[in-house]
Each structure stands twice: as structure tokens, then as C-alpha cells.
């Protein structure tokens, strides 16, 4: 685990190592959830296995919690901090276009990074907006970002998905969906015949 002082200065990383970057601790309830999302020793071992099995994964972090408003809050923060992130990317000569959708990470607690994903090393990471750079720089260097969930999060996600799909289980929605599928297939066949 790299400490805050090392992260504040920026640092070179060994290509064969995996590093744990703790995010700045938030206050209040958010700080509680950030602390809860720190990986356990079992999760760290599983992350090392994942990095070994998937050589193009450069950044791994906890999934966004399924609490009401988490996704909206993340999107709001991204919009607020996006200009600063774009300026830092420009200063690092990293021409990545940014859109309205926030990167998949960071979501809290920490980020696990593969040293090889950062051949130029890590830039100074002091503020919350600095940590948006980590998955973006990995992407620029050809590496993907991935999230991990606990067993409880995975079960909760299945429950939420099941509830969302329940409305589509009636006869009416199924026939509407079938009708759209047939209509689109006929339209494509008609266009290809021209």
C-alpha cells in the first residue's frame, strides 16, 4: 500500500507489482462506506489472481454501492471535477476526450493498480479529482479498469435486477418487445434488399 505522502509526490512503479492506492477519506457516512470498501486480505489475494489471469486489466476497485443516489452523486461529482481532470490530462500530454459519463473508477476505498499500466509512473495524487486520472491514464496506456463486488453486493445486485425485470414479465411487455424485434428485422431486410 502506498501512503499519502508518496502519492502526493507522484512515483515510479515496478511493472511486475500490484499497488494499493488509498483514496482520500471522505467525512461522515461517505467516509464510513469508503472504509467498508477497503479490500480484505482475501479480496487482495483474489485481485492478484485476477491481475494474473487478465493481463490487460490495469486498475481494479470496489464497485459502486447500490444505495439510492450513489450513481447520481458520482455523476454530479464527475461533472464538477471534469474541467480540472481535463486540465491535468492536458498537462500530462495525455489527449483523452472526456464525456458526460464518469469513468468506472474510483468508487471508494482504494484502487489496486498494475505497475505495468503506468510506465511513466503515477502523477501526484492529492485530491479527489486527481484519482480520476488513474483509470484514464491506464486506458491511455492500453489497460482496462474493472470493479469487484463482495458476495453481499452481488446478491443485492441480483435482487435489484430481478425487481427491475419484474415489470417486463407480463404478457403485454413481452408482446411489445416481440413486435419491436419483428419490426426491426423486417426493416433491416427491406433495407438490405435495396
Q: What residues fall within each predicted segment?
A:
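ER/Golgi luminal nucleotide-sugar-dependent glycosyltransferases, focusing on the catalytic module
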Residues: 1-194
Amino acid at each position: 500500500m502506498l501512503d499519502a505522502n508518496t502519492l502526493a509526490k507522484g512515483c515510479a512503479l515496478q511493472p511486475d507489482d500490484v499497488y494499493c492506492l488509498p483514496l482520500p477519506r471522505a467525512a461522515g457516512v461517505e467516509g464510513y462506506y469508503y472504509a467498508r470498501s477497503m479490500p480484505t486480505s482475501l479480496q487482495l489475494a483474489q485481485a492478484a489472481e485476477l491481475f494474473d489471469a487478465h493481463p490487460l486489466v490495469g486498475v481494479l476497485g470496489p464497485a459502486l454501492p447500490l444505495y439510492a443516489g450513489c450513481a447520481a452523486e458520482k455523476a454530479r461529482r464527475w461533472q464538477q471535477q471534469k474541467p480540472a481532470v481535463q486540465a491535468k490530462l492536458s498537462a500530462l500530454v495525455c489527449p483523452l476526450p472526456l464525456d458526460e459519463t464518469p469513468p468506472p473508477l474510483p468508487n471508494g476505498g482504494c484502487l489496486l493498480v498494475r505497475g505495468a499500466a503506468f510506465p511513466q509512473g503515477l502523477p501526484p495524487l492529492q485530491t479527489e479529482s486527481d484519482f480520476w486520472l488513474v483509470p484514464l491514464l491506464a486506458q491511455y496506456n492500453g489497460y482496462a479498469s474493472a470493479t469487484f463486488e463482495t458476495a453481499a453486493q452481488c446478491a443485492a445486485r441480483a435482487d435489484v435486477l430481478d425487481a427491475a425485470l419484474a415489470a417486463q414479465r407480463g404478457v403485454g411487455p413481452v408482446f411489445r418487445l416481440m413486435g419491436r424485434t419483428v419490426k426491426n428485422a423486417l426493416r433491416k431486410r427491406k433495407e438490405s434488399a435495396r
